[in-house]
Amino acid sequence: MSSAARSRLTRATRQEMLFLALLLLPVVVAFARAEAEEDGDLQCLCVKTTSQVRPRHITSLEVIKAGPHCPTAQLIATLKNGRKICLDLQALLYKKIIKEHLES
């Protein structure tokens, strides 16, 4: 095989490899994004909690159980003004509210 033929073969091989790499690039990006989104879900929503909210200002409560995303349970209150805040699960007042809610 002549050097010119070898050069054309090498160039064709490089072009094919580049074409394959360009085809695979979106797949790699999609996998990277999916992993980043999954990692983003694995965290506690409640970084800071409060025990200074009066029950009459609360319109709804959401309890998120502890799991792989967060080692502690989380209590999220929606207030009448639409704001969401995290309540301290150890506060006696909120323990009482949860108990009453579960009994009803």
Swiss-Prot record:
Keywords: Cytokine, Disulfide bond, Glycoprotein, Heparin-binding, Proteoglycan, Secreted, Signal. The gene is PF4V1. One of its GO terms (cellular component) is extracellular space. InterPro entries: Chemokine_b/g/d, Chemokine_CXC, Chemokine_CXC_CS, Chemokine_IL8-like_dom, CXC_Chemokine_domain, Interleukin_8-like_sf. It is found in: Secreted. One of its GO terms (molecular function) is heparin binding. The keyword Signal applies. Pfam families: IL8. PANTHER family: PLATELET FACTOR 4 VARIANT, SMALL INDUCIBLE CYTOKINE A. The keyword Glycoprotein applies. Inhibitor of angiogenesis. Inhibitor of endothelial cell chemotaxis (in vitro). This is Platelet factor 4 variant. SUPFAM superfamilies: Interleukin 8-like chemokines. The N-terminal processed forms of platelet factor 4 variant seems to be produced by proteolytic cleavage. The most abundant form is Platelet factor 4 variant(5-74). The lineage of its organism: Eukaryota, Metazoa, Chordata, Craniata, Vertebrata. Homotetramer.
